[in-house]
Amino acid sequence: MLSVMAATLNYIDEQVKGGLILPYFEDIDAEQWQEKIKVLDIYITDEVEGRELNLEARQKDYATNILSYPSDLPAAIIGLMPTLPLGELIICHAVMIREAAEQNKEAVQHISHLLIHGVLHLLGFDHELGQAEQDEMERFEIEILAGLNIPNPYN
């Protein structure tokens, strides 16, 4: 999992250097983004709790594969901190394993994709806002996965 997280953040770092603005971190300048160590929490849950959390967070009454809870700290507070908290990811293990089997994917490939997807949500990217946003997010995911020698999950 660490290699997936490192690849994701390295990719985003390069995109920020190229001018990408991160929706949830637009008040943080590129230099501060580059300097800070990024941190996040990852929690693994079961279907019962996953369903409860999805209902509470998204008003959807089923367990989903991954939930993202972005950090909402103001830039002024982040500026005082030694690290940059991105937020929390909650993975429903049973859903992730079931989806991998249904999609004929190795579990490690599927969890890698979900972690990348979740981190992008923590940064403010949202495929549910429209086709352009979905295309951008999927492009990021595909490029990061390719760097890890994992095939395009959308094929």
Curated annotation (Swiss-Prot):
Any GO CC annotation of this UniProt entry: cytoplasm
GO biological process: rRNA processing
GO molecular function: metalloendopeptidase activity; RNA endonuclease activity; zinc ion binding
Main location class: cytoplasm
A Pfam family of this chain: YbeY
Coiled coil: none
Cofactors that this protein relies on: Zn(2+)
Cofactor note: Binds 1 zinc ion.
Compartments reported by the entry: Cytoplasm
Domain of life where this protein originates: Bacteria
Known EC number: 3.1.-.-
UniProt-annotated binding residues for Zn(2+): H117, H121, H127
Record NCBIfam families: rRNA maturation RNase YbeY
Family listed: Belongs to the endoribonuclease YbeY family.
Name of this chain's protein: Endoribonuclease YbeY
Organism: Psychrobacter cryohalolentis (strain ATCC BAA-1226 / DSM 17306 / VKM B-2378 / K5)
Taxon lineage: Bacteria, Pseudomonadati, Pseudomonadota, Gammaproteobacteria, Moraxellales
